[in-house]
Regions:
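Oxyanion-binding/catalytic loops of NTP- or PPi-dependent enzymes
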Residues: 1-72, 79-85, 103-207
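Adenine-nucleotide phosphate-binding core of ATP-dependent small-molecule kinases
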Residues: 80-100
């Protein structure tokens, strides 16, 4: 029987989780035994592509190593390498392909996936994320906002009553979102959202 997973396709790191027998979300580690996978792609040749920590080792040393492409999702952007030019969607497909492969080696066949995106992602960026996942061989059940996913998880884990409006901040490696949310009967109502697609931890690191 196939499994349902959740994917955080992040700007700097990505992760996969699934519900265990008790209904608790647990991280599925990658082939390297890591809980998170660096969202970095290296084109070593026309046939050889590295993803994750192996690619990150060469970050900044060559134009063939690409990171933070999530920030350009939905835009007409191409990253030039010695082995071709690649869109953010194509690069995301490569990362998602590794996540799928590594996860299936541990839990078996994946039936469907829920993929999170920044709350301020444009419709084009959401569509590109959906296409990237599908091209990686994933059946996408839902695309949901990252603050919404965080609120659902916190509500379930803490047992707190979140029926009154709460503020959820999502400061990631490359994006910053804020959402005003209510949770009632496991249903999330998003009252309002805003954010910056070009502000995150990576920018603080450069300062």
């Amino acid at each position: 029987m196939g499994k349902i997973i959740g994917i955080d396709l992040g700007t700097t790191f990505s992760a996969v989780a699934q519900l265990d027998d008790t209904g608790r979300a647990v991280i599925v580690h990658n082939q390297e035994g890591e809980n998170i996978t660096a969202s970095v792609v290296e084109f070593a040749s026309n046939e050889l592509i590295y993803v994750g920590s192996d690619a990150k080792k060469s970050l900044g040393l060559s134009k063939n190593v690409i990171a933070q492409f999530k920030r350009e999702m939905g835009e007409d952007k191409k990253y030039e390498t010695d082995y071709g030019n690649y869109s953010p969607k194509h690069l995301s497909t490569i990362v998602l392909g590794k996540l799928k492969k590594d996860t299936e080696e541990i839990i078996g066949e994946i039936d469907s996936a829920v993929v999170t995106v920044p709350a301020n992602f444009s419709n084009n960026a959401r569509e590109e994320t959906m296409k990237a996942a599908e091209e990686a061989g994933l059946n996408v059940a839902y695309i949901i906002n990252e603050p919404t996913a965080a609120a659902l998880f916190y509500s379930k884990e803490s047992g707190e009553d979140l029926s009154e409006p709460i503020c959820v901040y999502d400061l990631g490696g490359g994006t910053f979102d804020i959402s005003i949310i209510q949770v009632k009967d496991n249903e999330v109502e998003v009252i309002g959202s805003d954010g910056l697609q070009l502000l995150g931890g990576a920018d603080f690191d450069r300062k």
